Amino acid sequence: MFFIVKGRGTLRYGAETRTIRAGDFICCPTGGPETAHQIINDSDAELAYISVSTMMPAEVCEYPDSGKVGAFGGSGASRLRHMTPADAKVDYWKDEA
């Protein structure tokens, strides 16, 4: 969820775009490429927003424009941050005993 504090810009949500401005609350439910979202400052002024998250221990994101998948989670020494091409294929049992 995002709260637009000041400025204006564009929200890209799937294939749609919408103008956003100060005072707007935005909710972007999870899903596939059809729910990918991006906030774009296409104005000449500063765009400021607050992002609110569930802070779940792990997050998987699809990047449809670049064909990647990212997996993120944890903190400190156990932190996970992994990006890979979406079409990379690895068998579940590869290198497993």
Question: Model-predicted segments: where are they?
Answer:
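Hydrophobic alpha-helical bundle architecture
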Residues: 28, 38-40
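Surface-exposed, flexible loop/turn segments at secondary-structure boundaries
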Residues: 9, 34, 57
